[in-house]
Amino acid sequence: MPRLHAPLQSATKSTSAVSTRVALEAYPGLLARELIGNTSYKSDDKAKQTPERLIARKQLLQALEMGQTRLGLRLKLSHAQHDTLVDDASGDSLDAVLCMVQAAWAQAQNEAGDEHYGLPACDPLEGWIVSAV
């Protein structure tokens, strides 16, 4: 999977060729809820970084690795990557992975011929969250 980079937006018009950059909006909580319901898996407050949240992060990663999402993708991680994600009680790294999975799904939709990256018809100013139904 190619490395993801944040697109740079410019307020000025470009005279160069048409850009191939695409900005997609992902929402990690959407995919997390699909996999573990409303179970909390993260907290910035050290006092709330509980064993229950650790278990939830493990369950979330297991579901991603087993391909249990409706997106039809499986996450492949090294042991070190898995451990790093589980150990990040803030959930920031895991949120980034959830967004990456959503972006990978959108890219797969585009490669399969969907010029809208799997997004339904929507207001171009409002946009749509990738994989939101």
Locate each region found by the language model.
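RNase H-like (RuvC/DEDD) metal-dependent nuclease/polynucleotide-processing core
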Residues: 1-133
